[in-house]
Amino acid sequence: IQLHPDEKDPYCLQIFESLSYEANSEFEQAPSTCYQHSKPDYAQNPNTLFDHSVPTQWQCLNYTDKRSIEMSGRLFGGCLDTVGLLLDSPFLALHEFKKHNASQGIVLYLESAELTPATVARFLLSLKLAGMFDDINGVIIGRHVTLQGQDPGFDYRQGLNAAFGGCLFPVIIDADIGHIPPNLNLINGALCTITADVEQGKVTNSSVVTKLA
């Protein structure tokens, strides 16, 4: 995230607000109206502010019928480019985190910065085979515009379907997470409840409530 002092984006400002919250505080977030498609050169133009011009539309990967969904638990996640490389290392202790928080469960969040669709699929399948998707309550995945159309023989959604096809828990994609602003303020280890309505794969009336407990 580019934290420019003149930036008025509420998602940016939420980061600083959350730093002042006391234990057991709650805050609620909702999907953005629009996101930024362009990639400014901050080295050449360091005072560039966000330009949110493309309509945001969260999607549900595995539910297309009309229904309400909810996922709740402790947040755990990060950038897939890094998480995938930490698999089976002591620095990705998800199994221990699951055991410690078994009563609340886990909401996993992921996004990718520079991976191709095929690499996204490989990383996700590696995590799946390692049991990372076992006994979790849901997944929320950030958008990555540069992946669209990057490989004409294998697109981004195919990669996600390869890993999450058949999963019973909700899988929300194209969310406000990652390297394409704006970004939700997700805090590892915090309790989170995500509710939404789904119809024809589109997500509406979304709410992300985080509790610092």
What residues fall within each predicted segment?
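Glycine-rich phosphate/diphosphate-binding loops and the adjacent beta-loop-alpha structural elements
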Residues: 65-70, 107-114, 140-147
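C-terminal active-site/capping subdomain that shapes the small-molecule cofactor and substrate pocket
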Residues: 116-213
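Generic secondary-structure signature for well-ordered alpha-helical cores
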Residues: 17-29, 85-92, 129, 165, ...
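Predominant activation on well-ordered alpha-helical scaffold segments within soluble catalytic domains
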Residues: 17, 80-88, 121-124, 157, ...
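Intrinsically disordered, low-complexity coil segments
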Residues: 26, 63-70, 95-102, 197-202
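Short acidic (Asp/Glu) and glycine-rich catalytic loops that position anionic groups and cofactors
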Residues: 57-63, 103-104, 137-143
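Oxyanion-binding "anion nests"
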Residues: 74-120
